[in-house]
Amino acid sequence: MPRLSEVITALDALWPAERAESWDAVGTVVGEPDQEVSRVLFAVDPVQETVDEAVGLGADLLVTHHPLYLRGTTTVAASTFKGRVVHTLIKNDIALHVAHTNADTADPGVSDALAGALDLNVVRPLVPDPSDPEGRRGLGRVCELTHPLTVRELAARAAERLPATAQGIRVAGDPEATVRTVAVSGGSGDSLFDHVRAAGVDAFLTADLRHHPVSEARAHNPLALLDAAHWATEWPWCELGAAQLDEISDRHGWDLRVHVSKTVTDPWTAHVASAPTSSAMGAPN
Amino acid sequence: MPRLSEVITALDALWPAERAESWDAVGTVVGEPDQEVSRVLFAVDPVQETVDEAVGLGADLLVTHHPLYLRGTTTVAASTFKGRVVHTLIKNDIALHVAHTNADTADPGVSDALAGALDLNVVRPLVPDPSDPEGRRGLGRVCELTHPLTVRELAARAAERLPATAQGIRVAGDPEATVRTVAVSGGSGDSLFDHVRAAGVDAFLTADLRHHPVSEARAHNPLALLDAAHWATEWPWCELGAAQLDEISDRHGWDLRVHVSKTVTDPWTAHVASAPTSSAMGAPN
Amino acid sequence: MPRLSEVITALDALWPAERAESWDAVGTVVGEPDQEVSRVLFAVDPVQETVDEAVGLGADLLVTHHPLYLRGTTTVAASTFKGRVVHTLIKNDIALHVAHTNADTADPGVSDALAGALDLNVVRPLVPDPSDPEGRRGLGRVCELTHPLTVRELAARAAERLPATAQGIRVAGDPEATVRTVAVSGGSGDSLFDHVRAAGVDAFLTADLRHHPVSEARAHNPLALLDAAHWATEWPWCELGAAQLDEISDRHGWDLRVHVSKTVTDPWTAHVASAPTSSAMGAPN
Amino acid sequence: MPRLSEVITALDALWPAERAESWDAVGTVVGEPDQEVSRVLFAVDPVQETVDEAVGLGADLLVTHHPLYLRGTTTVAASTFKGRVVHTLIKNDIALHVAHTNADTADPGVSDALAGALDLNVVRPLVPDPSDPEGRRGLGRVCELTHPLTVRELAARAAERLPATAQGIRVAGDPEATVRTVAVSGGSGDSLFDHVRAAGVDAFLTADLRHHPVSEARAHNPLALLDAAHWATEWPWCELGAAQLDEISDRHGWDLRVHVSKTVTDPWTAHVASAPTSSAMGAPN
Amino acid sequence: MPRLSEVITALDALWPAERAESWDAVGTVVGEPDQEVSRVLFAVDPVQETVDEAVGLGADLLVTHHPLYLRGTTTVAASTFKGRVVHTLIKNDIALHVAHTNADTADPGVSDALAGALDLNVVRPLVPDPSDPEGRRGLGRVCELTHPLTVRELAARAAERLPATAQGIRVAGDPEATVRTVAVSGGSGDSLFDHVRAAGVDAFLTADLRHHPVSEARAHNPLALLDAAHWATEWPWCELGAAQLDEISDRHGWDLRVHVSKTVTDPWTAHVASAPTSSAMGAPN
Amino acid sequence: MPRLSEVITALDALWPAERAESWDAVGTVVGEPDQEVSRVLFAVDPVQETVDEAVGLGADLLVTHHPLYLRGTTTVAASTFKGRVVHTLIKNDIALHVAHTNADTADPGVSDALAGALDLNVVRPLVPDPSDPEGRRGLGRVCELTHPLTVRELAARAAERLPATAQGIRVAGDPEATVRTVAVSGGSGDSLFDHVRAAGVDAFLTADLRHHPVSEARAHNPLALLDAAHWATEWPWCELGAAQLDEISDRHGWDLRVHVSKTVTDPWTAHVASAPTSSAMGAPN
């Protein structure tokens, strides 16, 4: 059975810490280098729910995409919800390892998993990593559809193929417009509009899009926008990561049990559609 | 018929420029002080669609909540979409006046209109303006429901009473929890969580809520969150502002025709719900 | 007749926007890409006087050296004098295009025109642009006189050859010193003293020189300084620019009428010399 | 005969160091507290010329308005011109004391002396010092003329009453406009335009005015501007300061000999007017 | 037996978190609010040695003066020495609470304990806390000696009364000078020289003094400086804090066992005096 | 006899100013370029004591390692202790030249002299200067011992070989540990721990080490730390520098008398060891 330090070395080889953004907080957050690891759980969010799932599963290592302390903390007291996560992990001898922007840009990375879930053919990174001579690593992916779809059909495929969430998929632009090329980026994508426009794609699927960036993007050009739940766009990476670790485990004869969290940590729990004859002023345009 | 400078003086009395946030960009953006005004259009967004509506209506003055140039510009060339707005306004002798954070905190202001649209009884500002001795001005409103509702029922009321949008209302928290007190804030509200928690309300209705702030808010305490479309939470203020200007016009004998834009400038045009049996992993928790 | 976008493409080829300083604000400020252009006016300052001249002239495009909004604006309301300029331009279908620090460093640029007006032989840029392999572009010019002149004679030539202004030419240093080499830089030049000293010239002609920089420069070494009116040092570029556009127009068969503004927008309107026996304390040293 | 520390205490009472701007560098720059003082020289600039004058005069203390090291130095080596000033002072046992923005705002201060030289009746400070309950201290002065003058006549009075300089007086605005009220501020005044406009005066006399601030001020409103030589606007303060120290000396029985520098350290040494028929384009507007 | 939250409430009453400096990191760092507390250990440093001592002692709560994470951390992995401290604490159900600059300025606080250990009579805070109407709180203490001592005698008393360290006490200034008044400040004190000079004391005892601040302080005035080991100057506060908690425990009937760490965490382990006839150049001056 | 400018040229060749850190303040601080130099004194600190020594010696040039005004000054008034140094130097025609971080990194530099004094064999710079193709220049030195010593023995050698100071040598770590490799850096070295750890040496000798950096360094790994007096670690460079100037003088036939200051300007004047049975709590660990 491998020690934590050995498993971490393998994870670091998949997602090297030095490839994370300077503002990021990746790597091992909790855990003793010499503790033994037999069961691993992959999840998007390091929250009490996924930690409790890890405890229930008897996991020794929880690997998440989101950092626990992005902006640094001076306390892990259990009176804070993040401190309670640390206490639960240490008390149950569960290590926590984070792969965030280093996993976003990896090859394959978060947006490769997202593209795969949507049956999209990856062409190139949306924002290539200048340090990669082969131009495969980078943030987001520019993709082609095998067969053109309307925006509505692409949204329906996303709603069907991504983990179900209360939010579903929001669409901006003509639902009947044709889509042949699409850029995808897991997580918050409203800082990437310049790159998306430069890529000249028909549509852009990402998460956490807000009023002003979307309105201005639409005013710039008729690019269709699809907004899925942040968690749902990054959950596919958990399956990818688990599969990668499985393969490493087999190669090393570690006999690891690698699981993917079934807990939906997307915060939205319900959705109420606008009534078509809302008393205010009329149906959406 | 009043000159633009007289109408602006009246609008400034309702929403004094000095009460806007230091980062904001309120006041008259386009227009000649001496041009005559007979027809006014209120809208949320100063975009080509509402400007074209103003041209079609023969308006002389467009009053919007959102600024045209929040971060300052060195060009109004028509090759930029905002420049085209400026050219359309000037060529058609239409002035543009903005009331943004000075209207947010006004008494009555944007969140009063939002509370009114939802039949909520305003108790106090969520973030009182320290310069107001009477404590009525400020950002957001803390409200009470005449009769308790479940979170789902409150969401349904919002979906029904606010202008219809493709997004509808997203809910985080237990849909069946009871709501007696609710904080509301028009527009992007994810910087107000500390104030909302301090107010001790059961629910918070605002817009543009993203994954991390919502997840962390939910981890803090079981506060229910309702996310409506940014535009829909601020449209009710247009009706309020138009009514206020109507009343001023009568008082001055200006005989102004004051309209409220019917153009839905919320960018979301369609919504596709997650399939309950989405192939990924199962229904929302 | 060419469309504005075609003429702008030509102007951008002369003075590429990317060669402007990062703090600058060059390019098209007002105008519709498809509007037709037959008459163009060159001026230094985008002020009401030159805009009224453009209206009177029936110009379709005003090209100026100084930007209209160097520091960005959130309003173009006609209640502001710059807003009135924008309203006058748009109402009279006159576009505005700015070429500022990109014209300063161009080859030929503002200081070439200034050197030409003074019969000076350009040797090299005072501050070479590192991105120019041929070392011809850059700020200011180091020049040689065909025949040596005294400082007083050089000042007299400047007063005679540059457009007349109330200010005339101020001189610091020994008026009878001999000048063989001179650095010139149109506009405010008091940030260039280190470069001027390094060039080892006998004199430096520029504008907007103030007490402390001049006193310290004089204390450093006996470099003669000639201060002409800011506007007057940059007006020769208008003639150069107009000639360059004329030539382009001929080449394209555009048949453009290209004019140079006759309006003196130097703000100084009068000059009163010190009385030789001023009651205070005596004649200048 | 008083020691330096005693004379400095008296000067600090006139111009307390704590009333200088935070960016300023006032107080004693060179000198031994116990050295005896019998002869004092007042000057505007601490330059080699005024220091040599002090040596020739046998002065023990040089008091100047301008600081020697405004931005701090790490060397006083004589290879630098300011270092040579320090070496000359110390070798000749001459102390140096600076009263700059603390003298600007004093009551009486630099602008009182300037107003006095121009026969103007001081009404109030242009920028009152909030820490002065009596509202007499502050930057610049708002003045009234005993009898109205045209702008040209006021400029002629300034040229006649202020120490003669090669620059003379530059005027912006209608030379024939009538002046009843005028704001004056010794030294560089182009940061005070907002205050001057708020004061509603007919004219503003100061120094070091440059193209853009003057053009924009003139575009704002028809305020006449008079630009004298920086040194000339501050030299009257030397007479005021010398008189004040004389009076203190008498009171203490110090028998000080107090002189005012006759050295014109305004850097401009000659002026050449524009030829009325300058070959370029015509007389000034 | 009290829960941790109750003990923390008592400690917060002694050293309120809001009285810490804004850059500080005080309060509970590890621990579950509901865990029971019967045994408490006070120490200066939250390092592996004191944590091991707490484990050996069966403590439930470790209270330290120095924060564990002053600048915030994004990981508590046991591969880092601070992370190993967190893991040891949580695995052994030991809470960690920090009272740092809020204990420095408390009344009584760190410097009161230091003064007490040295038999000094506290007169007032060296840097009074403006928010304390009674003027008793603040950083450092100004003290009087009951009987004057020479600097050497005071140093000997400090060496004798403070916990023994390899460093002992360094002295700057005349060892035979007389001391009647002394300022003391536990921990690094080289930012307090201005306050110490203003207090006009004969000597200043603190820690972590470096060459340049000491040389410049000595050049300013003949103030004697005594430099003890950082840890030794703050260890007396552990005794004071333990006694205060004991008293609170008695009052609440908590029956707490409160201990003070015996582990010397001063890092210096040996000291070698300069040989009087060191081959370099001679005995100290 | 050489002029000051010639000697400075020679010193600049040894320690080029451009190789100093950007925050540093090296070069000639006082002196007239043409003054003659026959006698030179080297010292660490430009303080009154070494300046008085220079006056007593009849020196013409004082060369120090520490700058006089590191952060720039706006006054050299003799009422300040640094101003008194300037007055004494100028009155006695003594120049002052500083070689600080440019001497630290020179080859040979400050840490070479320190290593030499301790009989250590220099291997390479601790922090190589990237601009040195030969990799010999840089901050600090990594050294080897000819024969291994215990930490205590190395500390004893330092106490014996470096100029005697009241402080002596402080040691952190096991005094009996064996040392084969040691990094040395004259002056304050607590910013170099990362480099020292990366060099993998057994011990690090420097100065001005404080509690927190030393405690954390020790927690990182068992690296032994030796803290000598700041002045003592830099005094050996004076001998090195004097020898280098002697050699230059012979080469130029200048016949310079070059001295090394005997004044100990280390501020510590006495040391009192902790009593082994200090009443507080026991002997050091």
From Swiss-Prot, chains A, B, C, D, E, F:
Task: Write down the InterPro entries for this protein, in alphabetical order.
Answer: DUF34/NIF3 (IPR002678), DUF34/NIF3_sf (IPR036069)
Keywords in alphabetical order, please: Metal-binding
Q: Which GO terms describe its molecular function?
A: metal ion binding
Please tell me where a divalent metal cation 2 binds in this chain. Answer: H66, H230, E234
- The UniProt annotation places a divalent metal cation 1 binding at H65, D104, E234
Gene Ontology annotations for the cellular component aspect, listed alphabetically: cytoplasm
Question: Does the record bear Metal-binding in its keywords?
Answer: yes
State whether it acts alone or in a complex, and with which partners, per the record: Homohexamer.
Family to which the UniProt record says this protein belongs: Belongs to the GTP cyclohydrolase I type 2/NIF3 family.
What protein name does the entry list?
Answer: GTP cyclohydrolase 1 type 2 homolog
Originating species: Streptomyces coelicolor (strain ATCC BAA-471 / A3(2) / M145)
